[in-house]
Amino acid sequence: MREFLKERLPLTEFSEHLRKPLPKHINLLFSLGSLAMFLLLLQAATGAFLALYYSPSPEHAHNAVTYISEEVPFGAFVRGLHHWGASAMVIIVFLHLLRVVLYGSYKAPRELTWIFGVLLLLVVLGFGFTGYLLPWDEKAYWATVVGVEIASTAPVLGDFVAKVLRGGAEIGAVTLSRFYALHTIWLPWLAFGLVGVHLFFVRYYGSSGIPQNTPEEMPSQPIEEGKPFYPHQVFEDVVGMLILFVVLACVALFVPVPLEDVADPTNADYDPRPEWYFLFLFQLLKYFQGPLEIIGTFVIPTVGMVLLLLLPFLDRNERAVLWKRPIALTVTSVSVVAIVGLTILGASSPKLETQEAPQPTAETENTMPTEAVEEAEEVFDFQLTEEEIEGTEEAEEVFDFQLTEEEIEGAREVGESQ
């Protein structure tokens, strides 16, 4: 059997690939990519479990989530792993990209590796946005309303994108169905496709390692070889995965995932808050309102993402050592501080200002009873003064009904008989 498989499967080539040496100067930060992959698989496994009991309709979604949390064996634990695992994945992917920036690992010939990594970050954020609506509680509904409204501010295609996301004029059953399809079908296929391409480039070009403080050691130059990927790096990655899983399991056990009341589209007083990794965008809306709103909702995020994608082509400094790249160091530091600062401010800031309900005018405040009420006053032989109409309970009762012509005629006959 061994010879049969050996002749038909590239086991020798695969073994040689696993034993390919890594750079000599490597540390635990190089396990972040493996941890991100582990979290993606964990999200797929826990999501598949939750999908067995979930129903993507406004009538059943909230009840299904409640049933999972309260009735399904280990349901609350699995839901906790899925929920907190999503946050952990955002953190790990962000730290992984930050490590690549600090070590200059995006430089030639690894430009495509970087681009596919940034695209993966966008997909991870897409998972968070589409999955947020699925519980169909107040927080999920109104945060999605804000998110779709932000998308609608994009020039040219904004209204089209918002309409496609909603599936109509308002968020409802079609919206929930589309978000569920994106979250469970489209984005997973896209994510695993990008991961496959990203891993291919990582293994093809190898890791750049830690840049050394010598002008000769550039990312494009040959790197001093160290220990093989298997078993040394594999062992470190597995240990990191186990530690991460234990941490997530503890959080899932002791920190229940919140679930608010079922979504009420008429509750316009609700203060919508996105998930924490979107709070920096939420806070930007506080500084750019009215005609300037598009700067916070579209211009800054789009420009930032384009610059991130094109970073390998914009950074022409051949040196990889961080302190010899002052521009990259400054831009990275300012960006990280800005994102973290805006996130903290967004978590503690008051709700966005909304347009106040129209206040009564002088004309509406002094409006006299309708024609039917005036006729009723004559029939029942009473006359309310303007002050009584404005301030008494009798005036409120008068305004709370509308007499028909038959009722007025009947009341007149009663009055004449008396």
Please place each PLM-identified region on the residue numbering.
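Alpha/beta-hydrolase-fold serine-hydrolase catalytic core, especially in secreted/extracellular enzymes
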Residues: 291
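Membrane-interface segments at or immediately adjacent to transmembrane helices
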Residues: 351-418
